[in-house]
Amino acid sequence: MEYKHILSSNQISLKTFYIENPMIAIVYGAKGEICINGQTITVTTNLTLIIPKYSQVSCDVTNFFPTKPIELHTLVLSETELQSVFSLLKPLIKSGAPITRHLPDYHLSTPEVVKTNFTLLQQCLPLEHGTPSQETLFMQQSLFFILLAVYHEGVDILNIFRFNYDEPKNQAITHLITQDPQRKWHLEDVAKTLYTTPSTLRRHLSKEGVSFCQLLLDVRMPIALNYLTFSNYSVFQISHRCGFGSNAYFCDAFKRKYGMTPSQFRTQSRQANDPNAIATMASQNDESIKKVF
């Protein structure tokens, strides 16, 4: 579990990238749009975001107040820590049950309890005389109250974090590819991993409106955007790490999708964003990149 406090004096404009670990974040002093898994969110000053693992995220926000920076607090979670907190929340969630629908809402206006707990994290971390395990316990306690407050605002956190819910096949495949994008994935390999047949899997994907080849490309491209934005790998290295058969094919597919070459995108992205904010985000994404790649 890791807490970060990020200030950006400039806009934050990022093409679609992957969040490998579950995350809760609050945004202050921003306006614009954030997109999580295809759901477009209009940002108006104070917002709490609930982001499940392997989510696709993009954003284009600017300062709401001309003289004040955009302020972002993030709490990145591990699956083990999240399950530990959910085990404590489960009895309370069952007894309260304010949820009337099971569609994922990835955002809400920041409740006072959430704001208070993130303020405590900012003020107290790192603990002056604390051990890493004590810091983790402190963050878990804050997470408990944050999730409970979000739930009582009517957000189905069980659904968002995919506890006890079946996921569409395209999402299951997305998770597989994201964990090993460099692998030369074939429909037969994926079907075997998901304990089904290629024909059945192809039929499921057809019902969900996507082909396997297109899904493969749609998953690998945001991973490439991650590398172009947050790393210094060459375009050739990125094409290899993302599983493209050749650098030429990667560059051609990238230009067809985004209307510019990978090198042009990297230059544009770095010119458009606050370098300090990008550097902080890059350090936060570094561990996730190492785990996945």
UniProtKB/Swiss-Prot annotation:
Classification via SUPFAM superfamilies: Homeodomain-like
SMART domains per the UniProt record, alphabetical: HTH_ARAC
MF GO annotations: DNA-binding transcription factor activity; transcription cis-regulatory region binding
Species this chain originates from: Proteus mirabilis (strain HI4320)
UniProt DNA-binding residue ranges: 188-209, 235-258
GO CC annotation terms, alphabetical: cytosol
Protein purpose: Positive regulator of the expression of the urease operon.
UniProt keyword annotation of Transit peptide present: no
InterPro entries: Homeodomain-like_sf, HTH_AraC, HTH_AraC-typ_CS, Tscrpt_reg_AraC-type_HTH
UniProt-recorded name of the protein: Urease operon transcriptional activator
PROSITE patterns for the chain: HTH_ARAC_FAMILY_1 (PS00041), HTH_ARAC_FAMILY_2 (PS01124)
UniProt xrefs under Gene3D superfamilies: Homeodomain-like
Keywords: Activator, DNA-binding, Transcription, Transcription regulation, Virulence
Signal sequence extent: none
Cystines in this chain: none
Domain HTH araC/xylS-type: start-end pairs: 171-268
